[in-house]
Structures are given as C-alpha cells and as structure tokens.
Amino acid sequence: MYKRQVLTYSAKECIIRDYNKEIKFITEHPQRNNLIRNLCIDLKGNTLVLFSLIKHGEFLHELIKEKAHVNRKTFFVFGGTDSETREKIRGIVEKERDAIVVASFGVFSTGINIRNLHNIIFASPYKSRIRNLQSIGRGLRTHESKAGAKLYDIADDFKNNNHTIKHFVKRIGIYNQEEFYYEIIKVNLK
C-alpha cells in the first residue's frame, strides 16, 4: 500500500512563488520535519528516508537520532559516503528489523539492494518517473520478514498550484499508470 501525505499550510505561508524559496521553506519547516521524524519513529520495520538536499538530510538524521530508541540503529548516507561504508550499512540493515536509513535520492534510489526494507519515505519533492520507480523498487525486493513495503510520499500543498504539488500530481499519474493502490491523507500544519 502506498500512502501519500499531503501537507497543507496556513494562508500566510502560502504566498511562496519561487521554486528555490519553496524548497528552502519546506525543508526548514519545523512541523514538517517533525512529522517526518515522528513517522520514522512510529513505523515498524526497516525504514528508508530519501532526501534531495544534503543539509536537509543531515538535519532529518539528527532529528530522528535524538528521538529514536537508544538501541535503534540510524544511518546517514549521501554522495560523500564511501562505497565500503555504504556496503557495511547495507549489510547491517539486511540483518536488522527496525533500522532507519536517511539517504540521498542520488545514492539510494538506484544501485543499492536492501531486500529487508519495509518502509520508504519521500522527504523531498521531485518529478522524475525513473527516479520515482527506482526508489519504489528499493522496497519491492522480496524478503522473508515482509509481505510488502509501504511508501509514504510527502507532498506540500500551498493552495496555489505550487511547484511541489505539481510534482506530486505527476507522481500520482505514475502511480495510476503502474496501477499502484494508494491513499491520500491530508495533514494540516497550521
């Protein structure tokens, strides 16, 4: 099952028109980041959180580590993480039952094979069909510990046909073409 979470903002927050300002706003929004953190903490099984901007990924990783149980393993992976370390993390997560990996789309959307992955969270907006399907593919690998995986695709609605909601609409089109079952849940951040 794929869950799409659409975050809505207050009228004052909905005046952003520039793409870069919009991305800066959502990646620095405390309630949005706390929602992602709390979702990670509440989910059972191994969870992959995918981000676009390194600064955002680092922040999410620290936020998650602060609240995660002391025995819950959390990892941060980005382009600067050497391949040996990536492989060690992959091996550890394959054996874990409740790890959290915060990773960049560029590194983890392709080429990393973790079959023991139960949840994927898209923490950053984008519209690429290939990246979308490759990222979902991380969770489709079979493993004896799961019947399937869940995707949490977080979108941001500024009520003005903003850039990130346009990207979300494109992703919904992909999900419809691929005949994925999904549910849209609105979350007010007011």
Q: Which role does the model predict for each range below?
A:
Residues L7-Y9, I54-H56, V107-S109, P125-R129, ...:
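Conserved nucleotide-binding/hydrolysis micro-motifs of P-loop NTPases
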Residues L48, E58-F59, N71-I112:
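Conserved helicase ATPase core of P-loop NTP-dependent helicases/translocases
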Residues V70-K73, R115-N119, E144-L151, E178-F180:
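Short glycine-/polar-rich loops that comprise or flank the Walker A/P-loop
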Residues R138-I172:
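Conserved segment of the helicase C-terminal RecA-like domain
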